[in-house]
Amino acid sequence: MKRIGILTSGGDAPGMNAAIRAVTKTAIHHGLEVFGIRYGFAGLVAGDFVPLTTENVDHKISEGGTFLYSARFPEFAQEEVQQKGVEQLKKHGIDAVIVIGGDGSYHGALALTRHGVNSVGLPGTIDNDIPYTDYTIGFDSACRTAMDAIDKIRDTASSHHRVFVVNVMGRECGDIAMRVGVASGADAIVIPERPYDVKEIAETITRGFADGKDHGIIVLAEGVMTADKFKDELLKYGDFDARANVLAHMQRGGSPTVTDRVNATKMGNYAVKLLLDGKGGLAVGMENGQLSTHDILDLFDGKHHGDYALLDVNEEMTKY
C-alpha cells in the first residue's frame, strides 16, 4: 500500500478536520501518500482528489466543519456508480480509503471494501447515533454549542417568566437532548426513544412557577415533533407564556472541543494502522474509553443505546 484517500460524507461535524489531520500525519509518518477526496462520494465518482501534506492539514485541528467539504450522494448505492468510484481510485493509484461520516457513509465504505478497496469508517455525526460506539466525532462539540445557547435562552426566559421549548438535533436518537438537558437544568427532556406525557410536563412547569421559579426550559429532540407543535400541545394544559426555539444547524458549527479533537485524533491514527495491517470493512469506535473495531456489516443490524439513566437523574432534579 502506497497511497490512501480520505473523505467526509453526510452532515458535517466538529472534529472532522482533526480526524483528517490525524490520518494525514500518521500516513505520512508511515511513508504513505494521502489524497483528500472532496465532496464525499460525489467527489470520489467525479475524481475530485487533492494531495494532502503535513503543511496543509496542521492548522486544521481547531477548525469546525470539514475542509474537504461534504455532500449527500445516495446514488452511490447503485452498483454502476460504485464501480465508477473504484475506477477513479485505481486511476489515481489509491489503495485504501478512510471514510468519516454516519450510517450512509458506512454503506459506502463497505461497498468499496467489497470492490477490493479496503476502507475503514470513522463515526462523524453530531447525533451520536452509531451502534457499537459510545461517542461520535462532533457530539461533544454539538452539546457544548446547544448548552451555551440554552444558557442564553434562560436569561431572556427569566426576564419575562417564560417557558422555552428548545429543539435540538436528533431524529431518532436523543443523546444531545439528554446530555444538554441535564447540563442546562431543563425542566423536561423529551426524546424519541422514550414515552412522555405533555400534561405531566405542563404540571411540572406550573409547579415550578408556583414555587418561585422564573422560567421553564424544555429540551426537545427534533425527532419527536416540531418545537412549535410541542409548545401548542403544552399550552393546552398550562397557563403560562411559552415560546419555541430551534437551534438547528448552529449545532454543527464551531471549533471542536478538547474531547472531539483528542478522540478524532486517536481514531484517525488508529484507522491508518488498521489499513497498514491490511484490514478493511471495519468501523472504528470508542467503547468504555477505549478504541474498538467492529465489522461495518454488524452496525447495520446493531442499535445504539443511549445513557437513558440521565432521564431519571433529570426527573429527580426537577422535583425540588
UniProtKB/Swiss-Prot annotation:
Mg(2+) binds at residue 103. Its main location: cytoplasm. Keywords: Allosteric enzyme, ATP-binding, Cytoplasm, Glycolysis, Kinase, Magnesium, Metal-binding, Nucleotide-binding, Transferase. ADP binds at residues 21-25, 154, 185-187, 213-215. GO terms for cellular component: 6-phosphofructokinase complex. It comes from the Bacteria. SUPFAM superfamilies: Phosphofructokinase. InterPro entries: ATP_PFK (IPR022953), ATP_PFK_prok-type (IPR012003), PFKA_ATP_prok (IPR012828), Phosphofructokinase_CS (IPR015912), Phosphofructokinase_dom (IPR000023), PKF_sf (IPR035966). It holds the Pfam family PFK. Its EC number is 2.7.1.11. Catalyzes the phosphorylation of D-fructose 6-phosphate to fructose 1,6-bisphosphate by ATP, the first committing step of glycolysis. Homotetramer. Belongs to the phosphofructokinase type A (PFKA) family. ATP-dependent PFK group I subfamily. Prokaryotic clade 'B1' sub-subfamily. PANTHER family: ATP-DEPENDENT 6-PHOSPHOFRUCTOKINASE, PHOSPHOFRUCTOKINASE. This is ATP-dependent 6-phosphofructokinase. The gene is pfkA.
